[in-house]
Amino acid sequence: MAHTGIRSSPTRRLATAGLALLVLTIGSGRKPAVAASHREAPRISLDPPADITDFFLFRSYEPGREDKVILIMNVFPGGEPSSGPNYFTFDPNVLYAFHIDNDRNGKAEDVSFEFRFRTEIRGLVDQFNLFVSYVGCGVRTPPCATPLPPITSLDGPGSEGLGLRQRYSVTMVRRGQRLKLAEGLIAVPSNVGPSTTPSYDTLAAQGVYPLPNDIRVFAGQRGDPFYIDLGATFDTLNFRRNPPLLTPAEDSNDDVNPFGIDTIGSSNVQTIALEVPASLLTVDHKSPSETGQPKLGAYASTSRRKVTVLTAPTRSGEGDEDEDEVSKSAGPWVQIQRLANPLVNEAIIGTDDKDRWNATEPEEERQFLDYYLNPRLALALQLVFGVPAATSGRQDLVDLLLKYEPGDKRLSELLRVDLRTPPTPLAAQRRMTVLATPPDPAGWPNGRRPRDDVTDIAVRVVGGPNYVGARAGDGVNKNFRPLTVTFPFLATPQVGRDRVHQNPPAGP
């Protein structure tokens, strides 16, 4: 099909001008993207524990810790909170990793952090060979006939009911030199319910560990921070207002959903969060205000060994960090998913190439250049709504998503952050970041925070000036659950016992 987009030079100039502010953010402390990455490719949709739903990179906005850089990876999309008896865990056969480019050569191999998990069956579940992973008699009426201690601790007294427990290690790799920062850390379990996990926030706080070099880490369940009217979006852009345009008042109100439904707001995810001093990541080991290279590029990845052999299950606890109880893996690690800017693979890369894209390195992005120059999302918007979109010749998207500066020759799909931009406190953050009035330069595409509305930003930026000016969006302006101002920043996961299969109503 021939592209039917606007082709005249004046319109092309309008499209470029409409994105000029975002292009400038790469150099001044901002930048764009598209959305999230839930089940975005055929192969990874069959592998939930390795499926990265979101990747966040930003300067910490926790008071007193603004000199830190935050990296967050979420996996396991669509986590149903009540999904017992095993709930959700990380996969011991997956290598989870963050990769950082600090010298702007487009190769995110300067600093990396790797995470490996192992699973053990223990406590009351092992003692009585119970059919559930977690057990406890906390807040309930009437009380249990036999007093079983609820899960109030990750280890020691109060952890007896934590039957399925995961420990993990953290390794930092700097230019090929490996340093194990920690091992034997405990991942926070799922939020089962008031009887089993009665003081969940207190339990989760125990999962924040201090590491050497003033690093902090968290692994465990959190509420899914991504917000979108998912059902309406994938019903061929069948939004709940036609055309899907926000009024100026609606667009400036980040606390009300004008007409959309946060479809995945009550789902949970498995989170790996890392807080690192900026000086540990910069090429010259200096702070954000002192470094001569303030721009970082990064992405998250999941990998599996090249060969996996299924084996007969062993007795619980006999596995090690390289294998779980039912499989053995060998050979080199093979990348099976990557994520930097949100929704690139979901809304830009064509279905035929999605699996191949996930397996390639970010610096190999030139082979996918046509998808950026001729975005299919823009074409879809034009076909559905009949409003001209910028469907071809989109060098502006190439500059935004694949470069540190528009003049760069190297193309690399990384999420980039300018450390010179001061973080915006959570209460003052604007979901539309640089498209807001007034602009908030500390959000996507200058890194990405959980609050940033990458769906609406993507629709407008990819659609072009007509969609920017008309304030197009999905009608969801906020997450179903409130974010926190402290590390690891994501909301308390939805409690399993109280999960109701009813989405919050559409906005007024």
Regions found by a protein language model. Give the residues of each.
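Sec-dependent N-terminal signal peptides
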Residues: 9-21
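Surface-exposed extracytoplasmic segments
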Residues: 32-508
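C-terminal segment of classical bacterial N-terminal signal peptides
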Residues: 23-32
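N-terminal secretory signal peptides that target proteins for export/translocation
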Residues: 1-11
